[in-house]
């Protein structure tokens, strides 16, 4: 999921 990318990389 793309949402997980920004969520983890915040």
From Swiss-Prot:
One of its GO terms (molecular function) is aminopeptidase activity. Its cofactor is Mg(2+); Ca(2+). Its EC number is 3.4.11.-. Optimum pH is 7.5. One of its GO terms (biological process) is proteolysis. Keywords: Aminopeptidase, Calcium, Hydrolase, Magnesium, Protease. Aminopeptidase which hydrolyzes substrates with free N-terminal amino acid residues but not N-terminal blocked ones. May be important in the nutrition and pathogenesis of the organism in the human oral cavity. This is Aminopeptidase.
């Amino acid at each position: 999921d793309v949402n997980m990318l920004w969520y983890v990389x915040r």
